[in-house]
A protein has these predicted regions:
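Nucleotidyltransferase catalytic core that binds NTPs
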Residues: 1-182
Length: 182
């Protein structure tokens, strides 16, 4: 079996990839507009993400997490797809797996599904309310070692100490998309 050796000039160094990883955005997407999509687009360009996956959660999951949602799942997905229509589909996608399940899906189950489906490394973006809930889950310690968490300081929710203890795995983003300190 041929090995496929290639000749390269002395001192050749392979260029690092121009884009890296997948950004998984966990949100309700209920009150989103072009502004929020623009913010995500700017973050994706700045950090050079290869793929951005928007993951709206079913109302059963949101109810169990204690996160209010007035709109049904299918309306939020339709709104999100409408907002993303002008962006390149090969880079920006909406994953509707949770809508097919039509029931409560734990965050770690969703993360397991998404990490099996998309390329690594993984960056998970959540607002501060989601992140505070996620830090209280049993599987948080396992997942924070596998993903890097981008916490969007959107609602001013105080973050638990367990989350802040993993400061090297967290990045904080202000309301306008700028990097902020805790």
């Amino acid at each position: 079996m041929a090995r496929g050796n290639t000749m390269v000039p002395f001192g050749y160094e392979e260029e690092p990839p121009a884009q890296r990883g997948t950004l998984l955005v966990f949100e309700t997407f209920e009150d989103w507009s072009e502004d929020e999509i623009g913010l995500i687009e700017a973050i994706a360009d700045q950090r050079k993400f290869r793929k951005v996956v928007f993951y709206p959660q079913h109302e059963e999951s949101l109810k169990r997490m204690g996160i209010p949602s007035a709109s049904p799942y299918h309306k939020r997905v339709k709104l999100l797809e409408e907002l993303l229509r002008d962006l390149p589909a090969e880079r920006y996608t909406v994953d509707t797996w949770e809508g097919k399940r039509k029931k409560y899906t734990p965050v770690d189950t969703s993360l397991r599904f998404l990490t099996e489906k998309f390329a690594s490394p993984y960056f998970v973006m959540m607002n501060d309310r989601y992140a505070a809930e996620f830090a209280g889950y049993k599987g948080f310690d396992e997942w924070i070692r596998k993903v890097r968490l981008l916490v969007w300081k959107r609602f001013g929710v105080p973050l638990p100490g367990k989350l802040l203890a993993y400061g090297e795995r967290l990045d904080f983003i202000g309301e306008k998309g700028e990097s902020v300190e805790v």
